Regions:
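Alpha-helical transmembrane segments
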Residues: 2-7, 11-175
């Protein structure tokens, strides 16, 4: 029962934080690709031969096709349907990996970017706690509007952070 509840939380959380991360040209798609590549590499290190890794590659190819038209200035928008589909696919990938907790570091930038807003609203609605008031959410809005980052800087810097974390995951597994 507890595992089922945790699965629901993982899937719901992944869908919503990925959806909240959408909003800067290429950001959500690029971070999703980095996360999926991380799971792909981990699955190969763990020698998971169930065929799901092929689906991961297909999803990456689909997102690359989308990113071709979503690069700044975007000519194609993902919308809720696309970002939610990516979120559910990431959560299913985490579950299929056999180590759902790997979702946290593998998608840490998505979690922080989208999750901060969910946390802020939840604290206000449920407990009337007004912390994080000086932080705009999602986090990509904060760095663009309060720190002066351009859309491209935001996308590249967030991607670099996720690549570094993903490389650390792979390095730990290879040791």
């Amino acid at each position: 029962v507890l595992f089922g509840i945790l699965i629901v939380i993982l899937v719901w959380g992944s869908i919503n934080v990925t959806n909240c991360t959408d909003g800067v040209d290429g950001l959500s798609g690029t971070l999703t690709i980095i996360t999926l590549v991380t799971f792909y590499v981990v699955d190969n290190i763990m020698e998971n031969k169930d065929g799901f890794t092929l689906l991961i590659l297909f999803m990456i190819i689909c997102i690359l096709g989308y990113l071709w038209y979503n690069a700044t200035p975007s000519r194609l928008l993902m919308g809720d349907a696309g970002s939610r589909a990516m979120g559910i696919f990431i959560s299913i990938t985490a579950l299929k990996s056999g180590c759902p907790l790997l979702y946290i570091p593998a998608a840490i930038v998505i979690i922080l970017d989208g999750g901060l807003g969910l946390l802020k609203v939840s604290l206000i609605k449920a407990f009337k706690i007004h912390i994080l008031t000086n932080i705009r959410t999602p986090l990509h809005d904060h760095v663009r509007k309060k720190m002066g980052w351009s859309n491209t800087q935001t996308m590249v810097r967030f991607s670099i952070i996720q690549i570094v974390v993903s490389a650390a995951i792979v390095s730990v597994l290879l040791v």
